């Protein structure tokens, strides 16, 4: 590696006619920035003449037109100066593969050799050094670090910003502890050479400096860990008074410390009711519409009760986003209002937390015989940096590459590895620390999954508590169903099988063989081969079982195009399935017995810490395999009040088969083991009523006999002034006119609407098929409309990434299905128009819905009125709530489903919404109304 000029970096950025130089695409602009001795010493940019047409989308993205290239120099004219700058330097680019292939293509066309020096990718470097960022686009990084980036997608500006980003990242790299740099050097052999160069130079500098270890780090067993914040738990917690009006009132404590404070009567009412139910030991259901400030309304009485009882109050949410919002935004605001510190601890399931002992063992492996993949190396580097920054060790903080999440399965905490007696890292480990923090906290913020696990499996993960708030409570019934149900797939078995490492020189076999060689008298030399044969036999039987299952299920249900296929275990478990399952069951027991036997035998030997960790991993894998076999058995055994179904891919491949089971009705379980075991539970959400009634929620959650108190709080927004609901009367209907005509009408309506809205449009669909079909029809028109389109499943499935891209473009359309109907906050100009394509009824072939409906019909009830309609109304209200998020928002809601006006049940949807102007008219009239709404002088 050439280190003579290791302090010189040349950043290159190119704008091109396309993405494929091998197909003739050419550079049309090149930007360059020289970084030398820690400073940007030179910047330059130039248009580049070429004989290719500039595609319209490139011109729209960059602003470069063919006129700009008329007098531009050729690349061959620019090449000598570029090569002079590159002499002895490390070449840097943001997405180096792209820029380097174009640069080398042009160099070779001009008669020069391609660049052969060190290269550095700032995307790779940023991913490594900033492992918790949401994204690594240059514009996002510039915004994150306050770098001036006036002309995105112009080569000169992009190169200069990348140069300043490089300097920031080098500064961070050189500030890392020496032990972290040592670990990085050992695990980045597949990164770009420039990255290795930077790490090597940082190591040299830090090794010779007098401040090798910053006081903010704790160096423990070759890891640099962030020191946890000192706690002052020796001080007695101060009790607080409770007076909702004094706290939330117009001249209350909150008004004096919050610049965005708005007095809301509903907030006061909710706080008082939560307080009263906590005091009286009663349950409360609160529907708090958007804008009522429900989070603070329950946090204030929750802290009061916690201090009064000297015991934590638990707050449970469905989504990670709300957990973080409560911890990072709402609790600090409450602290300011109360004028005292509040201890709020986030506690999740064990698998969310990193096991340091496993991580240390993995590092030892990749420094030895194990060959780590590129994704594993990048993930390890991210984890090493993250350890210097995280106090929680929670994977939710990380933005790992795709392969990194498979690695996490190896590194996450589990009961075998995480015990005080056998873990050298126990005093530093994150999961025990999280549990300890929870025991001392005023508020424990957790998720529905852990809450339900604690109740139904009696794991005692959560400390003892009497008072609970369930936010996002409209998800509780579904979450409980998932928890009380089960699923298993062929792929899950394969992941377990691969962890044994039967086919590779890695995994358990490679490691256990080394241990056996070190203790030859303890275990027979033939042991590994015998175990491999057992596992290969078990693998064969798994294949046979899933082939038999797929055949039996498809034979039973000829609708092979259906995504889900219901089955009854007694119908599917024919002779072939039964015999295959018994062979799998027996083979699995043999494997588990043999591997547990060797751990017992080897534990009698004098083992190294690494060997101890390996045996813990063996036990964990045996437990996982045993659990998987038990779950599969439950999916092949009929139980009353359960529904069973299977899913596979379009080709019905057995290796893509997944089996599910769910309880049809969980009201009895919730009533008996959940609500009866907690003194006071507050259930809250923005969507819990249908037509102003809580009865559907009460029935679903098993609260019929409990008689909870109910409170419905209307929104403080003036919907009659801020929004309108518009329904086109001339729109086709899917049932009568066909899906193709309906889809074409949706696309045409959207195209027509863009000129009136002139801003962001959110489109909510009820199926992925609809999203893809409308997106396909819209795509050819987006350039003419000067709009960007982001569609779930077309532009990716990452919701937060799609929302961020949507918000970054002023004229954009975001299309999504289920997960986009709730949980995304798009205030103000972020959404000007909301399109609800169809009323969100559950698919009629949904297995759980079908089973529930059948049960209701069997008892003489109407499945439509008691199940389908309430579900759809609650989902509709969630979607409706995406538009108006603050008192200053204005926007239009278009419902392209005439049933909301024409069907008898349509009024149930309308009566569940706040009062606002509703118009049922031809499309042209609604588009004219939209034009008037957005251009009446009240908005730009």
Regions found by a protein language model. Give the residues of each.
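A contiguous, basic/glycine-rich beta-loop/short-helix subdomain that forms a polymer-engagement track
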Residues: 409-442, 452, 457-459, 588-731, ...
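Signature of the SF2 helicase/ATPase Hel1-core->accessory helical subdomain module
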Residues: 324, 415-443, 447-586, 688-700
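Conserved non-catalytic scaffold segment of RNase H-like nuclease domains
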Residues: 2-118, 131-153
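Acidic two-metal-ion nuclease catalytic site recognized across multiple nuclease folds
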Residues: 2-4, 168-241, 245-246
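Conserved pre-motif I regulatory segment
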Residues: 238-285
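A substrate-engagement module of RecA-like helicase motors
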Residues: 224-230, 241-252, 310-312, 316-442, ...
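Conserved RecA-like P-loop NTPase helicase motor core
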Residues: 717, 728-741, 793-900
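Walker A/P-loop
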Residues: 279-301
């Amino acid at each position: 590696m050439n280190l003579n000029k290791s302090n010189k970096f040349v950043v290159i950025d190119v704008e091109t006619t396309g993405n494929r130089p091998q197909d003739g695409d050419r550079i049309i602009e090149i930007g360059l920035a020289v970084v030398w001795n820690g400073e940007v010493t030179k910047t330059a940019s130039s248009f580049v003449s070429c004989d290719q047409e500039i595609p319209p989308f490139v011109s729209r993205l960059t602003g470069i037109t063919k006129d700009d290239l008329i007098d531009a120099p050729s690349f061959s004219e620019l090449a000598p100066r570029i090569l002079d700058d590159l002499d002895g330097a490390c070449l840097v680019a943001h997405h180096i593969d792209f820029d380097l292939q174009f640069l080398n293509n042009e160099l070779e066309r001009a008669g020069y050799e391609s660049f052969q020096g060190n290269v550095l990718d700032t995307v790779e470097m940023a991913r490594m050094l900033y492992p918790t960022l949401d994204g690594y686009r240059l514009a996002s990084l510039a915004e994150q670090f306050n770098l001036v980036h006036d002309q995105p997608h112009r080569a000169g500006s992009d190169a200069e910003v990348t140069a300043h980003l490089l300097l920031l990242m080098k500064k961070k790299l050189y500030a890392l502890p020496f032990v972290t740099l040592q670990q990085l050097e050992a695990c980045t052999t597949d990164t770009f050479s420039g990255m290795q160069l930077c790490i090597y130079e940082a190591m040299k500098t830090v090794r010779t400096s007098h401040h090798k270890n910053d006081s903010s780090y704790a160096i423990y067993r070759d890891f640099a860990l962030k020191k946890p914040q000192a706690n002052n738990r020796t001080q007695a917690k101060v009790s607080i008074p409770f007076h909702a009006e004094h706290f939330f009132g117009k001249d209350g404590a909150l008004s004096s410390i919050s610049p965005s404070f708005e007095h809301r009567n509903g907030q006061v009412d909710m706080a008082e009711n939560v307080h009263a139910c906590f005091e009286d030991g009663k349950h409360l259901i609160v529907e708090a519409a958007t804008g009522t400030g429900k989070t603070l309304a329950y946090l204030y009485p929750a802290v009061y009760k916690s201090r009064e009882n000297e015991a934590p109050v638990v707050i449970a949410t469905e989504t990670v986003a709300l957990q973080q919002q409560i911890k990072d935004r709402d609790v600090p605001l409450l602290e300011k209002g109360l004028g005292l510190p509040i201890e709020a601890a986030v506690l999740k399931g064990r698998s969310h937390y990193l096991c340091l002992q496993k991580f240390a063992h993995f590092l030892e492996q990749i420094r030895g015989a194990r060959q780590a993949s590129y994704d594993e190396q990048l993930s390890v580097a991210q984890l090493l940096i993250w350890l210097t920054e995280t106090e929680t060790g929670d994977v939710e903080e990380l933005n790992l590459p795709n392969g990194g999440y498979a690695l996490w399965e190896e590194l996450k905490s589990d009961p075998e590895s995480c015990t005080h007696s056998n873990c050298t890292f126990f005093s530093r480990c994150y999961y025990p620390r999280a549990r300890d923090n929870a025991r001392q906290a005023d508020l424990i913020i957790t998720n529905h999954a852990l809450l339900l696990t604690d109740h139904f499996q009696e794991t005692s993960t959560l400390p003892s508590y009497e008072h609970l708030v369930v936010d996002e409570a409209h998800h509780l019934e579904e979450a409980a169903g998932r928890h009380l149900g089960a699923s298993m797939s062929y792929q899950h078995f394969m992941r377990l099988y691969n962890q044994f490492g039967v086919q590779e020189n890695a995994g358990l076999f490679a490691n256990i063989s080394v241990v056996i060689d070190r203790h030859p008298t303890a275990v027979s030399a033939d042991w590994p081969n015998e175990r491999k044969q057992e596992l290969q036999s078990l693998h064969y039987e798994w294949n046979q079982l899933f082939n038999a299952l797929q055949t039996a299920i498809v034979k039973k249900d000829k609708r092979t195009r259906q995504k889900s296929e219901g089955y009854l275990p007694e119908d599917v478990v024919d002779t072939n399935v039964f015999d295959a399952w018994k062979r799998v069951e027996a083979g699995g027991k043999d494997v588990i017995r043999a591997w547990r036997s060797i751990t017992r035998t080897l534990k009698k030997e004098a083992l190294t810490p690494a060997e101890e960790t390996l045996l813990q991993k063996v036990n964990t894998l045996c437990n996982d395999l045993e659990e998987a076999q038990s779950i599969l058995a439950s999916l092949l055994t009929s139980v009353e009040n359960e529904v069973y179904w299977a899913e596979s891919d379009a080709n019905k491949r057995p290796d893509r088969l997944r089996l599910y089971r769910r309880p049809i009705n969980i009201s009895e379980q919730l009533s008996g083991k959940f609500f009866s075991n907690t003194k006071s539970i507050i259930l809250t959400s923005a969507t819990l009523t249908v037509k102003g009634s809580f009865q559907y929620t009460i029935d679903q959650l098993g609260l019929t006999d409990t008689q909870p108190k109910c409170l419905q709080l209307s929104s403080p927004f003036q919907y009659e002034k801020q929004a309108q609901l518009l329904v086109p009367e001339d729109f086709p209907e899917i049932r009568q006119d066909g899906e193709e005509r309906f889809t074409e009408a949706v696309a045409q309506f959207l195209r027509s609407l863009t000129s009136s809205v002139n801003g962001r449009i959110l489109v909510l669909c009820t199926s992925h098929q609809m999203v893809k079909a409308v997106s396909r029809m819209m795509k050819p028109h987006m350039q003419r409309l000067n709009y960007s389109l982001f569609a779930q499943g077309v532009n990716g499935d990452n919701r937060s990434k799609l929302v961020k891209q949507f918000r970054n473009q002023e004229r954009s359309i975001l299309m999504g299905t289920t997960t986009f109907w709730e949980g995304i906050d798009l205030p103000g100009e972020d959404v000007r128009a909301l399109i609800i394509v169809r009323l969100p009824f559950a698919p009629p072939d949904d297995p759980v819905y079908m089973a529930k409906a059948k049960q209701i019909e069997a008892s003489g009830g109407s499945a439509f009125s008691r199940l389908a309609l309430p579900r759809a109304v609650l989902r509709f209200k969630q979607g409706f709530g995406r538009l108006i998020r603050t008192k200053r928002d204005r926007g239009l809601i278009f419902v392209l489903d005439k049933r909301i006006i024409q069907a008898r049940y349509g009024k149930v949807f309308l009566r569940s919404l706040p009062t606002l102007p509703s118009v049922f008219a031809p499309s042209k009239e609604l588009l004219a109304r939209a034009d008037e709404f957005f251009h009446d002088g009240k908005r730009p």
